[in-house]
Amino acid sequence: MAATLLDVCAVVPAAGFGRRMQTECPKQYLSIGNKTILEHSVHALLAHPRVTRVVIAISLGDHRFAQLPLANHPQITVVDGGNERADSVLAGLQAVAKAQWVLVHDAARPCLHQDDLARLLAISENSRVGGILASPVRDTMKRGEPGKNAIAHTVERADLWHALTPQFFPRELLHDCLTRALNEGATITDEASALEYCGFHPALVEGRADNIKVTRPEDLALAEFYLTRTIHQEKA
């Protein structure tokens, strides 16, 4: 059955290895409590009633995913990921060819709040381009001298935002922009950058700064703290 605007599919690129975590286990399979980071990230998406399907792109030879309860979840589809994030996202988009709108969410971003997700999804009612969750920059920003550990100058932080996920776009538009950007050799660091490359200006939807991505070892304890606090607040 074709998806409608009321239904949203999500793509989670989970084929990375996360070398900065300094662990043999890919970071998305590290545990916080009784769930892996990947499970926390996916369950946050499925908690919203509009999200009816999640496509997870995993690396070839990944033997860990099959051991998770997610592997047997009726709303989960698994595809082979690629060498780069954009390749994995495109593989996921191919699996939801009939979807009108698609979320893309980091596999290692487990602290997504439902109110943030709801605000992001609401933009589909009046946007043809989509948007991303983002957090305004609060710290003083410095640009370094190329190749040196020295300050070149201070960067004006007004209008600077940290790009977060999920990012939310019309499926066909995202597919076309990613394909064009890759074919033309553009540097794609997130899905929004592919749309920017093609001349579009996605919306910035302010989200919570504690929607962190687990990238370094110290992030794991911080994510555990945020998740534990959220669970306690929901039970209160």
Swiss-Prot record:
It is an enzyme of class 2 (transferase). The record marks R157, K213 as: Positions MEP for the nucleophilic attack. Pathway: Isoprenoid biosynthesis; isopentenyl diphosphate biosynthesis via DXP pathway; isopentenyl diphosphate from 1-deoxy-D-xylulose 5-phosphate: step 2/6. Its EC number is 2.7.7.60. Keywords: Isoprene biosynthesis, Nucleotidyltransferase, Transferase. It catalyses: 2-C-methyl-D-erythritol 4-phosphate + CTP + H(+) = 4-CDP-2-C-methyl-D-erythritol + diphosphate. GO terms for biological process: isopentenyl diphosphate biosynthetic process, methylerythritol 4-phosphate pathway. One of its GO terms (molecular function) is 2-C-methyl-D-erythritol 4-phosphate cytidylyltransferase activity. The keyword Transferase applies. The record marks R20, K27 as: Transition state stabilizer. Coiled coil: none annotated. Belongs to the IspD/TarI cytidylyltransferase family. IspD subfamily. Homodimer. Catalyzes the formation of 4-diphosphocytidyl-2-C-methyl-D-erythritol from CTP and 2-C-methyl-D-erythritol 4-phosphate (MEP). This is 2-C-methyl-D-erythritol 4-phosphate cytidylyltransferase. The lineage of its organism: Bacteria, Pseudomonadati, Pseudomonadota, Gammaproteobacteria, Enterobacterales.
